[in-house]
């Protein structure tokens, strides 16, 4: 009986540590992701751009989806 109680207490302690670690990790990621809020979002290579408000990234143009601008004449 003592072993069962000990195992339950160890399981509860381990679960608490894991949950605390996960919440700290999520909080750290939230602060990192918030730094890019000032950047304008753009649609990258092969991203659907037709009939949307988004614009293609620099060096791409919209022809149903964002395609790379190729300068054939050099």
From Swiss-Prot:
GO CC aspect terms: extracellular region
GO molecular function annotations of the record: sodium channel regulator activity; toxin activity
Propeptide segments, given as residue ranges: 21-35
Main location group: secreted
Disulfide bond annotation, renumbered to this chain: 42-57, 49-62, 56-66
Its biological purpose: Weakly nhibits voltage-gated sodium channels Nav1.7/SCN9A. High concentration of the toxin (3 uM) inhibits Nav1.7/SCN9A currents by 80%.
Family recorded in the similarity comment: Belongs to the neurotoxin 10 (Hwtx-1) family.
Protein name in the entry: Mu-Sparatoxin-Hp2
Organism: Heteropoda pingtungensis (Pingtung huntsman spider)
């Amino acid at each position: 009986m003592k072993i069962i109680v000990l195992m339950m207490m160890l399981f509860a302690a381990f679960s608490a540590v894991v949950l605390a670690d996960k919440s700290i990790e999520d909080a750290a990621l939230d602060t990192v992701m918030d730094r890019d809020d000032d950047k304008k979002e753009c649609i990258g290579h092969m991203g659907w751009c037709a009939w949307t408000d988004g614009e293609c990234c620099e060096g791409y143009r919209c022809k149903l989806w964002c395609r790379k601008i190729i300068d054939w004449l050099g």
